[in-house]
Design a protein with these regions (language model features):
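N-terminal secretory targeting modules
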Residues: 1-162
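Conserved SGNH/GDSL esterase-like catalytic core that processes O-acyl groups on lipids
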Residues: 82, 110-113, 118-125, 131-140, ...
Length: 230
C-alpha cells in the first residue's frame, strides 16, 4: 500500500480570521506594532496570543496535517496544552454547520501532527483554529502531494461587519479544552460570522490602546465583558 507523501504549505497563503487590525507586525498577533512600547507589558505579551484566530482553506486531500512552532511554549497546570498551544480543525457541512474534525495536540514548542487521514478525496472547506494562550512563530498545513489546497470558495464565517469581543481570561478562552471551544469561537460557528477575540487574561482594565484597536473595526456588535477584572 503506497502512502502519498505530505506537502506542507505556509498558512500565511490563506485567509486569517479573527484579527482586529491588518497592521499587526507579526501575522498571528492581535495588536499593531505601534503599541509595543505604549501598552503595559502584560497586555502586550497577551496580545501576542492568537486567541480567536483561524485559518480558512479548501482541500481535497485524504490527509490534513500541521506543523507549527509555538511562540512562548506555554504550559499551565489548570488548562490543557491542546487548548493553550494546540490547533483545532473544523469542516463545513453542506447545511452550513461546522463539524469538529480533530485537534492537533502539541508535544512542545515545535510540533508536527497528522490531524486526520484516510478521508475520501473530495473538496471540503476547512477552518483551523489557532492557540488560545500562546502565539505562533510559524504554521504550515500538510496535504497529500497530489492533492490541492486552495483559497476558500465559501464566505463562511461571513467576514463583513464582524462581532468584536473584549474581556478577561474567560473570554480569551481559559480554560477551554481545545481552541474551538472558546466561547467566541463557538458563537462564530453558530452565527457563521467572524468574531474577533480581544480577551486578555487578568488584564481587562479598559486600556485606551485596546479601545483604539477596537475602533478600527467596522463591527456589527461590540461585546464588552471586562467586569470580572474591573
Amino acid at each position: 500500500h503506497i502512502h502519498a507523501q505530505l506537502v506542507y504549505r505556509d498558512a500565511s497563503n490563506f485567509p486569517l480570521l479573527g484579527r482586529a487590525t491588518e497592521s499587526a507586525g507579526a501575522r498571528y498577533e492581535r495588536f499593531p506594532d505601534s503599541l509595543k512600547n505604549i501598552s503595559r507589558a502584560p497586555l502586550w505579551n497577551l496580545s501576542r496570543n492568537s486567541a480567536g484566530m483561524a485559518i480558512r482553506f479548501r482541500s481535497n486531500s485524504t490527509t490534513i496535517a500541521a506543523k507549527w512552532v509555538a511562540l512562548f511554549n506555554t504550559h499551565m497546570n489548570h488548562m490543557t496544552d491542546t487548548g493553550a498551544k494546540g490547533l483545532d480543525l473544523y469542516c463545513l457541512q453542506k447545511n452550513g454547520d461546522w463539524r469538529f474534525v480533530n485537534s492537533a495536540r502539541p508535544k512542545g514548542k515545535t510540533n508536527q501532527v497528522t490531524i486526520i487521514k484516510n478521508m475520501h478525496p473530495e473538496e471540503r472547506e476547512y477552518m483551523l483554529y489557532l492557540p488560545l494562550y500562546d502565539g505562533l512563530v510559524s504554521l504550515s498545513i500538510g496535504v497529500d502531494s497530489l492533492a490541492t489546497i486552495s483559497q476558500p470558495l465559501v464566505d463562511y464565517p461571513i467576514r463583513k461587519n464582524p462581532v468584536v469581543f473584549y474581556g478577561t481570561s474567560i473570554l480569551q478562552g481559559g480554560c477551554a479544552s481545545r481552541p474551538g471551544m472558546a466561547h467566541t469561537n463557538i458563537i462564530s460557528r453558530r452565527l457563521n460570522r467572524e468574531c474577533i477575540n480581544l480577551g486578555f487574561s487578568g488584564n481587562a482594565f479598559l486600556d485606551l490602546e485596546v479601545a483604539k484597536v477596537i475602533a478600527e473595526v467596522e463591527a456589527s456588535v461590540f461585546v464588552l465583558d471586562f467586569v470580572p477584572n474591573a
